[in-house]
């Protein structure tokens, strides 16, 4: 009788412990989803403003290649969520690597806004992101954040961390 009673208490404690863990996991997943949705909404709204600025550029209007570089959170849009998301959820939809960052902007602008930018080659993106001209450019929304570098319309959202 004692072992049955101990077993039932053990099962009850185990079940309660698992329920607490499951609830914590569900809360964390919801926090992460809320943070990622807010980040995406912020970036899409920013992308809309960036495209509006690009459309004013004569080289863009003439079909020049375009590259958008930088993470909004490293520029004018730093973000700290009070929801305490997991570390990977805080990365946002854009990479810190210049090539993947540029590709992320191309995909985001096309998927969310229906605007197809004239992409440039990965080697060109790397060359521009490492150039002194790019490093000297101000970040969006300052005047001069859009410049033509080596024939590519370059829009600088933020500096890269390296």
Cite the ranges covered by each PLM segment.
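Signature aromatic-anchored transmembrane alpha helix within multi-pass, membrane-resident enzymes
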Residues: 2-28
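Intrinsically disordered, polar/acidic, low-complexity terminal segments
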Residues: 22-162
